[in-house]
Regions:
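Acidic, low-complexity intrinsically disordered regions
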Residues: 1-216
Length: 216
């Protein structure tokens, strides 16, 4: 079905579990730089930011992109375990319900989830991996949602595949200062592509993968 607008729904699911300790300033700086760059681009966009450890908290809930404030150390502090599956499941459920009940002409033409984690799921209690996989596959097939998965200290490609995310939409990264910088520099391109009504390149994560392989 042809959409009646060129609105982009952006959903960032960011790991803030204890293993991210020491990368707080890099994460905050990279996030803010990416947002400021996107504010200069054309196209209407709503943005949600979900932070997760052993539980999820919503930092931004579908705010217009140009109204996203800078992230601070008060917003992003690390703690706890890694309830990745629950964070993804909650976010899909929330955004899906909003799209279900708004006027058809107001449903964003494009929806992009960007998921970053530096470890294996170890604290889910709401959703199973199989349930989230079915949710992701449904949103992809029925509504054309896109999902990018960026993981450290795990096999990101295999983990993404277990969630129903295509292998060419997943990439491994190093959870250190340099790797975090490369991550945020790289993800601007697929965001921009969606906002311009273009397809995300299958090589969107090449710079991240190159850094990972170079320092493996």
């Amino acid at each position: 079905m042809k959409k009646e607008n060129n609105i982009t729904e952006l959903v960032f699911i960011l790991d803030r579990s204890g293993s991210m300790s020491g990368l707080e300033s890099d994460t905050i700086g990279g996030f803010n730089t990416k947002i400021e760059k996107q504010k200069k681009e054309d196209g209407e966009a709503y943005m949600s930011t979900v932070l997760f450890d052993n539980e999820s908290s919503v930092l931004h809930d579908r705010l217009p992109l140009d109204r996203i404030p800078k992230m601070t150390a008060r917003d992003y502090s690390v703690r706890g375990c890694t309830a990745l599956v629950d964070a993804i499941g909650d976010a899909i459920h929330h955004i899906g319900n909003i799209h279900k009940y708004v006027r058809p002409k107001d449903v964003p033409a494009h929806t992009l989830f960007i998921i970053t984690t530096d470890g294996q799921e170890n604290a889910n209690y709401k959703y199973s991996s199989d349930t989230v996989k079915k949710m992701i596959e449904r949103q992809k097939e029925k509504y054309g949602w896109e999902f990018l998965f960026i993981g450290a200290n795990i096999d990101a490609v295999e983990t993404a595949a277990s969630f129903g995310i295509a292998r060419n939409r997943a990439v491994n990264y190093h959870a250190d200062s340099e790797g975090t910088q490369v991550l945020y520099e790289t993800i601007s391109a697929p965001i921009s592509a969606m906002r311009k009504n273009q397809a995300i390149s299958n090589t969107w994560g090449a710079q991240i993968e190159e850094d990972f392989q170079k320092r493996k």
